[in-house]
């Protein structure tokens, strides 16, 4: 699945052009409010089990129409001759406007990166899921679970998202099959901060365009960056045909083709072993 397609206009352009202009936090014509929703969009798409297609972290919320012409006008699918300017050369606004210094943009990169790490390292995201909005789609709830796991492991994840133009409370309807309340859940996108839940239906406040991700156990993700310099491993010769050596010992080495196919796996390799 995917939240936006390469042959349809960008989410942020659609939001600020055709989005809801009412309420306390309108998105129509309000780039900040629109960008604030990108985290929730990621949470309700990336975290759902199964493959996802994204492009450059949604281009950090690029709000330029894909149908922008050389002169700055937009010739989209609603015009008499639609899509004339889809292939026109466009200003790369992410560089001219220095988006890497814009926290509204970089928060998308940060949030989506965390979600990708969470999904690709926690086995529960290989399990099942249920989508069950609270009364309407603006109060979105997604339940991700693997009932074969013990409760001492991360076996349940609850995603809440508020797509309204107002701050709302959401009934989380936390699972009760193997849990008793009060109990502690963990905010997986906030450094595993513990949250005491007194009742599975106790309302949780979620600001407009925001989201929460709860787990029955903390994520095992480490916050420590991998130090490439001190953990450098050299493989030589490169390229190699029949044999190669490594500069350090390793518990396991796997070799893949450029298309992702596993070619060979080695275990307990010693330094300089061929």
PLM features per residue range, with description:
Residues 175-192:
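Solvent-exposed beta-hairpin/edge-strand motifs
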Residues 6, 45, 57-59, 115, ...:
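Conserved, mostly hydrophobic/aromatic
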Residues 128-135, 216-236:
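Residue-level detector of functionally pivotal "anchor" positions at catalytic/ligand-binding pockets or at interdomain
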Residues 50, 54-57, 62-157, 215:
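Glycan-recognition and catalytic regions of carbohydrate-active enzymes
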Residues 163-179:
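Surface-exposed beta-strand/loop patches in extracellular or lumenal glycoproteins
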Residues 197-220:
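C-terminal beta-strand-rich structural cap/linker in extracellular carbohydrate-active enzymes
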Residues 1-48, 125-138, 150:
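Alpha-amylase-like alpha-glycosidases and glucanotransferases acting on alpha-linked glucans and related
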Residues 226-274:
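C-terminal outer-membrane/trafficking sorting elements
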